[in-house]
């Protein structure tokens, strides 16, 4: 089946200035935007130190699918998309997947991010803020793009994070003015360390601290340490589950499986995105799934965790699956959704059909449907 592609008549000029910073980008990772007193303190670097590198559009940035060959459209893209199509949709041989994944470091989005790394190993001269150009969020994007484990630039960035953090009995924080550990940041740094192969004994200590912070409902919450909250946060819980899963699948020495199972039960009890008391949607934003998700929870990110963990297809997740199906367009793609406000090094996709949304939705639906048929 042949596909037709339509190009925009005029390419959008490359950005030479940072994207506008929205205050919501600095909100604490909780169930709702945090008040100003609960926002992460910025690092020493200021917004004026962030410089965006102008990047010209590439042909696949401008293409629009008008036929039904979605698979070919997905493959006509960046290596970060292609290797994940090979791995998750095609189930291609490992050597095919690995060969394509290696290209993330030398072509496209991955190469662009690596090119703007500072000589000292940071990004934007800062560890956690500004969002989303700091070292933490640049490394998170490289993780989602699939930069291979052991890449020297990622290891240098991880070293800066782990050496620059403040430690509190295993938990850590990157903010200079908050003298308490932060669960989301601890989880993100564990995820990055295990994703890129950063070897540090403090990783095990951080994992043990995360295990100790699990709440009786199975979730985690950044505000437990600060405010004594005893109800899990969707945002904190998904970040912690992703970290524990990566720790377990990369040979971590601590037993985390039971804690992860209880964390997934937390989401099942909430039908993934609803109040366990009223059944109402906790936040309408949970039903949208921009890429990258940053520290935010959404239904696709939640289901991606269940997929990668090959967890049970709990019937209480069916509601969220239906929401994703309903978002599919008539051309069998899913549209680009507005990203979380903040600064970006460059735009990943233009408005219209989104390869990231389509890839992520398709592999979640395939996982669900395969399990139901079995």
Give names to the regions the model predicted:
Residues 22-31, 38, 43, 47:
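Asp/Glu-rich intrinsically disordered low-complexity tracts
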């Amino acid at each position: 089946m042949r596909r037709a592609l339509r190009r925009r008549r005029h390419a959008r000029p490359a950005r030479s200035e940072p994207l506008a910073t929205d205050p919501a980008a600095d909100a604490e990772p909780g169930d709702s935007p945090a008040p100003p007193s609960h926002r992460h303190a910025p690092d020493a670097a200021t917004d004026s130190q962030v410089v965006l590198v102008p990047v010209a559009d590439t042909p696949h940035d401008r293409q629009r699918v008008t036929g039904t060959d979605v698979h070919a459209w997905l493959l006509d893209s960046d290596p970060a998309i292609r290797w994940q199509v090979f791995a998750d949709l095609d189930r291609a041989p490992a050597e095919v997947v690995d060969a394509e994944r290696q290209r993330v470091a030398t072509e496209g989005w991955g190469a662009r991010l690596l090119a703007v790394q500072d000589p000292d190993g940071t990004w934007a001269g800062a560890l956690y803020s500004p969002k989303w150009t700091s070292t933490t969020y640049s490394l998170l994007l490289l993780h989602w793009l699939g930069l291979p484990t052991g890449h020297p630039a990622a290891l240098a960035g991880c070293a800066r994070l782990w050496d620059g953090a403040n430690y509190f009995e295993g938990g850590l924080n990157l903010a200079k003015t908050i003298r308490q550990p932060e669960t989301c940041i601890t989880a993100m740094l564990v995820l990055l360390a295990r994703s890129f192969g950063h070897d540090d004994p403090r990783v095990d200590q951080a994992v043990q601290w995360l295990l100790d912070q699990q709440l009786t409902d199975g979730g985690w919450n950044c505000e437990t340490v600060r405010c004594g909250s005893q109800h899990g946060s969707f945002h904190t819980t998904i970040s912690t589950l992703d970290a524990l899963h990566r720790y377990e699948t990369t040979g971590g020495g601590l037993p985390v499986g039971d804690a992860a199972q209880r964390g997934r039960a937390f989401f099942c009890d909430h039908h993934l995105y609803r109040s366990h008391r009223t059944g109402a949607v906790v936040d309408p934003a949970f039903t949208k799934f921009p890429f990258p998700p940053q520290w935010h929870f959404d239904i696709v990110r939640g289901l991606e965790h269940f997929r990668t963990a090959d967890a049970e297809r709990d019937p209480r997740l069916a509601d969220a699956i239906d929401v994703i199906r309903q978002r599919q367009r008539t051309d069998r793609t899913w549209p680009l959704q507005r990203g979380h406000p903040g600064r970006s090094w460059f735009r990943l996709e233009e408005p219209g059909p989104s390869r990231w949304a389509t890839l992520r939705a398709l592999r979640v639906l395939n996982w669900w449907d395969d399990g139901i048929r079995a």
